[in-house]
Structures are given as C-alpha cells and as structure tokens.
C-alpha cells in the first residue's frame, strides 16, 4: 500500500506544481497583453428601407429597376451597409465598407481603401473607392438630399464596377478654396466588350468652395443648414479616346429665420464612355428646411426635375455588324419629397414621388412611397 500512497502524494504534488506554473504563465501573458494597444477601429451601420407603390418598373435609389410588373406595392430593404475604419498610424488608415443591395439581393464590397493622408495638400488613396466624378456620385444615396438621386440617369453616369466605385489609385488635396482630385482606374478595362484593355481610365475633379469649406474626399448633397455653401465643380474621365464630363453646383444658405434653402444643379455630357450612343443631360433641385422643431425633427420639402437626351446615332448591330440608325430620345424625371429630418443623415424619414416619361418608348412610370434611413 505504501508505494501507492507515495505515488498519490507525488501525483498531487505534480498536479499542484502544474497548476501553479500555469497560473504564473497566465499572469505573465496577461501582463503582456495589458501593455498591447490595438489600433483604433470604428464600426458603423447604415440602413435604407421603404414601402412603395408603382405603376410599372419601380426604381431603386441607385437607378436600377425594382419590379418589372405593373401596379406593384410592397416593402423593400433597399440597402444595408457595414462601415469599418481603422488607423495603422496617424497617417496610414484603412476603410472597408460592404453593402447588401436590394436590387441584386447580394452582398458586395463597396470600399476597400488604403488611405495615406499626410496633410491637407497631399493625400493618396489606393484600392476600391469612388473615383473623381460628379458631386452626386461622390455623395451617393446615403448623403443625397433626395431619395432617388440616380433614377434619372443624369447623375452618377460614369463607369463603375460597384455602386459608382472602381479599382485604382488617386491623389487629392485642398489648396484654400480649391480641392483637387485626380486618379487612374480600371474603368472599362473590366468590360469584355472593350477591345483595347491596355489603357486605363484617367479621372479628375476640381471643386471651388467660395463660402464654407468641405474637408475630406467626399461631399454631401446638403448640410441641413450647418454650412453656408457655394460650390462649383468640374469633373471628367477619359479612356480609349472616349470622354465624359460634367459641371455641378451647390448653394446652401441658412436664413435669418434659421431655416435653410438648398439649390443643386448639374450638367453632364457622355461622348461614348459609358454608352454606345452619346448622351447629355441636366437636373435642377431645390429644397427648404423649415426652422421649427416638430417633435424630435424638422420638416423639409424638396423638388427635382431632370432631362436626359440620348443623341441620334448609328450603332452597330452585334449580330449582323450592320449600322442601325437610332433616333434621339428624351427621358424626363420629376421627384417630390416631404421629409422629416431627425438627425441629419443618421435619422430621417420621408415621403417621395417619382414620375418618369420616355419619349421614344412612349411610356411613363409613377412611383411613390415612404423611405427610412438610419446610420450609426
């Protein structure tokens, strides 16, 4: 029996030593971990959802068709986004944004950006992001003043691979009232229909902010009275001898009664960069934010009118290789909003009406509904 008791004693002693050793090791590792500081990371979420009714071919806020049938009513999760931003150092940062898109019922990578930001005048971005383009493309559906900014086909007409984004590298900097943005991107080189894929797309934008500045790479469609803004922008892109350019303007002024009036306009011209047939178009938008607080928010009214003209052209039939004459076509779009602004773009809800008429197709679309946007 004695050998067994001795073995038990040694076993208990060995077990005790093992526990003590593990405890000491844990404490040491814990002390090491306590000294490690992870890079700062922020996580955010954005949601857009709607209840709608349309006569035919309901349209998403990104301009794609929602439903092809007539007299459609329903609810839609238009979009949900996940935002992740982190800093490697004070000057090297990373952005990663994803989106579930209700128009495709799929999740895609919106932005994947390595951001090298050294000063107001010198910054380099590389990866997937919005190239220098029109103001509307650079604010997108979550920071637009209206609910369906791309339904007219005028705004955001530049080539892209994911909601206006493209893969490439860009420089941007601020010089007083002038912001300069320029870059090189894949563009149409991702499109198998383009014969010459050896040339990349070049893009550039100049923005003049005569009143308050707009810091950073991106823009807003409105600042809900937080800024007095008078901005003028010129953007252009070129690839394979095809060009597209636009001129845009935004004016926002807080009035003596603390209400805010906003006026936005854009003219665009596409010489075959994104469409076989050259086209041009324009839109004008005006909104007024009432100063009175109604409950937890303020009332805003908005109206927008746009017209896009697809030029007459001789296009090649891909099957027969014959040239087919296409007549000029005009597409006219009207949008009306009555919005309830709770916390700028982080919490807003609104009624919208969208009407669109196509002269050549001799069709008209009418859509109205309620939209909700939340961000954190």
Question: Could you describe each region identified by the protein language model?
Answer:
Residues 64, 79, 246:
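Short amphipathic alpha-helical segment that frequently serves as the phosphate-/nucleotide-binding helix
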Residues 35-61, 69-190, 196-214, 220-224, ...:
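Outer membrane beta-barrel
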Residues 13-14, 29, 129, 349:
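Hydrophobic alpha-helical segments, especially transmembrane helices
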Residues 214-217, 259-261:
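Short, structured loop/turn "capping" segments at alpha-beta junctions
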Residues 28-34:
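Sec/Tat signal peptide C-region and signal peptidase I cleavage site
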Residues 5, 38, 68-70, 113-117, ...:
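Outer-membrane beta-barrel pore domains
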Residues 1-12:
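N-terminal secretory signal peptides that target proteins for export/translocation
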Residues 17-28:
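Bacterial N-terminal signal peptides
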């Amino acid at each position: 029996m004695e050998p067994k008791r001795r073995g038990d004693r040694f076993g208990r002693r060995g077990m005790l030593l093992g526990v003590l050793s593990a405890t000491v090791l844990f404490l040491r590792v814990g002390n090491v971990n306590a000294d490690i500081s992870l890079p700062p990371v922020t996580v955010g979420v954005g949601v857009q959802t709607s209840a709608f009714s349309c006569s035919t071919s309901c349209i998403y806020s990104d301009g794609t068709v929602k439903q092809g049938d007539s007299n459609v009513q329903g609810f839609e999760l238009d979009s949900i986004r996940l935002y992740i931003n982190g800093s490697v150092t004070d000057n090297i940062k990373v952005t990663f944004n994803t989106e579930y898109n209700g128009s495709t019922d799929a999740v895609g990578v919106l932005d994947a950006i390595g951001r090298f930001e050294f000063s107001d005048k010198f910054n380099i971005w590389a990866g997937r992001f919005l190239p220098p383009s029109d103001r509307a493309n650079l604010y997108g559906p979550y920071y637009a003043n209206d609910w369906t900014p791309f339904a007219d086909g005028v705004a955001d007409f530049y080539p892209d691979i994911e909601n206006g984004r493209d893969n490439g590298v860009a420089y941007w900097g601020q010089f007083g009232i002038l912001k300069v943005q320029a870059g090189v991107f894949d563009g149409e080189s991702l499109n198998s229909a383009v014969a010459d894929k050896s040339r990349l797309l070049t893009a550039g934008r100049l923005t003049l902010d005569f009143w308050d500045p707009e810091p950073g790479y991106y823009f807003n469609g409105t600042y809900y009275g937080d800024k007095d803004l008078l901005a003028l922008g010129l953007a252009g892109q070129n690839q394979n001898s095809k060009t597209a350019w636009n001129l845009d303007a935004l004016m926002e002024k807080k009035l003596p009664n603390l209400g805010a009036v906003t006026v936005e306009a854009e003219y665009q011209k596409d010489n075959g960069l994104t469409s076989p047939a050259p086209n041009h178009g324009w839109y004008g938008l005006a909104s007024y934010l009432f100063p009175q607080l109604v409950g937890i928010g303020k009332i805003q009214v908005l109206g927008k009118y746009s017209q896009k003209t697809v030029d007459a052209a001789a296009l090649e039939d891909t099957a027969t290789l014959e040239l087919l004459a296409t007549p000029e076509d005009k597409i006219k779009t009207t949008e009306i909003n009555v919005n309830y602004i709770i916390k700028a773009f982080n919490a807003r809800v609104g009624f919208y009406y969208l009407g669109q008429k196509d002269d050549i197709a001799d069709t008209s679309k009418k859509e109205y509904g309620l939209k909700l946007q939340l961000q954190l």
